Amino acid sequence: MFENLSERLERSLKILKGEGKITEVNVAETLKDVRKALLDADVNYKVAKQFTDTVKEKALGMNVLTSVRPGQLMVKVVHDELAALMGGEAVDIDIKGHPAVILMAGLQGSGKTTFSAKLANLLKTKRAKKPLLAACDVYRPAAIDQLKVLGEQIGVTVYTEPGNNKPVEIALNAIKEARAKGFDVVIIDTAGRLAIDEMMMQEITAIKEAVSPNEILFVVDSMTGQDAVNTAKEFNERLDFSGVILTKLDGDTRGGAALSIRTVVEKPIKFVGTGEKMDAFDVFHPDRMADRILGMGDIVSFVERAQEQFDAEQAKRLQKKMGKGKFDYNDFLEQIGQIKKMGNMKDIMGMIPGVGKAIKDLDINDDAFKGIEAMIYSMTPAERMNPELLDKSQSRRNRIAKGSGQSIQEVSRMIKQFEQTRKMMKNVAGAKLPNLGSMMRR
C-alpha cells in the first residue's frame, strides 16, 4: 500500500542526506518535493501545506546533536508529523453497554456489509463478545443475503425481518432481540446513500436518534482519494459520526484519503480493510502507518499477526524435528498453512523493514502456495516423510508433476528450495520462519 507515495518521499528526503547541517535553503528544497509528492498522492491541498509548514518549523527549530545527520533529523520530523496527521494514536471502539450499538454508514459499494461482518468476527474471536448483525438495508435484497452468508461463515447470528421495509423498526427490534437473548453488541448494517439524498439522510438520522448508538462508523473506499474525504465531510455534518473505516487500503498506492481525512473531518480512523477475507482488516495505528509510508516496515504488526497464528505445541514439536534435521514435507505443509493464515503475502512481507521496497516490482502471488501444496499432496506418504526419496528419482518427480498439474521444472525448483529451507531451519533450530518469500514469485 502507498508504494508510489513511499518512493516519492524517499527520493525527496535524500536531498538532505549529503548536507552537513539543516538550513532554510535545503529544508525549503526538500519540503517543496515533499509537498508535491503529497499533492500527487491526492492529499488535500490545505492538509499538505499545513503539514510541510509544520515540518519546516520543527526542523529549523530543533537543537541538533552533532551525531545526528540532517537527513536522519528530517526523516524523524516527517515521521512524527505523518503520525500526528493521521491521529497520533490508535483509537478503540466503544463497546460498553448491554448491548452496545454500532451503526454503520456510507456510500453504496464502500464495503459496509463486508466490514460489518469483519467487525463482528473480531469482536467474537478477539474480544470474547457475542455480536448480533442487524440487516437494515431494505432496498437491496442482495445485501441481506450477503450478510446472512457472511454471518454463517463466521458463526454470527444475523437478525432480519422479511417483509418489513422500515429500517428504524428493524434496528429497534434487533436491539430488543439482543437484550432478550444475551447479545453483547448489535452491529446495524444500513443501506448505502448519498449525502445529497435528503430522504435517505433523514432515514439514517432517524435510526441514529432511535437507537442512540455507542458508535457511528463511516465506511469509505480509500481508493477514491479526495472524493472519500469530501463525502466524509458531508456525512459528518449531518451525522456527526464517531470514526472512519477505510476499506480497500491494500489496493491504494497513493494514500490521499488516509492522510487527509483525519484533519478534514476531525474524527479518527479506527479500522482499515486490507482484503476480502474476514480477518483482512486491522486496527489503525497512525505511528505504524507512518513507518510503512517511510519504508521502515511495520515489525510490530508483523509480530502480532504471527503470534495470532502461533501454535505453541506445534512449534515445540517442529523445533525438536528441526534440531535433528528431520524437517519433512508434512512439516512444510503446516508452515505454509500458518503463513497463509497471516494474510496477503505481499502485505505481510511489506511489514518487514527493508523488504517493502525490494518487492515493489515483484509479482508476489498468493496462488503460488496452491501449486506448492498441490505438489506435496501429489507425493506418497513415504515421500512426504522421507524427502531424500525425491533427490535423484526422475520418475517420482514426473509423477508428482503430472498429479499436481505443474511442470517438471517447477517440481525440481520446489524440491531445491525445500532443501535450502531444511538446511537453514536445522541451523537456526526453529528460531526463524522459513524464507518462503522467494517461492511466491512468478
Where are these regions (language model features)?
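Amphipathic alpha-helical interaction segments
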Residues: 29, 33, 50, 54, ...
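Conserved phosphate-handling catalytic cores of large alpha/beta enzymes
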Residues: 171-175, 179, 183, 195, ...
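Short, surface-exposed connector motifs at secondary-structure boundaries
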Residues: 126-132, 154-158, 184-186, 211-216, ...
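Short, small-residue-enriched loops and turns at beta-alpha junctions
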Residues: 109-110, 139-141, 165-167, 192-196, ...
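Primarily NTPase-proximal linker/entry elements flanking Walker-type ATP/GTP-binding cores
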Residues: 8-136, 143-164, 171-190
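Residue-level signature of catalytic and energy-coupling elements of molecular machines
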Residues: 16, 42-44, 78, 107, ...
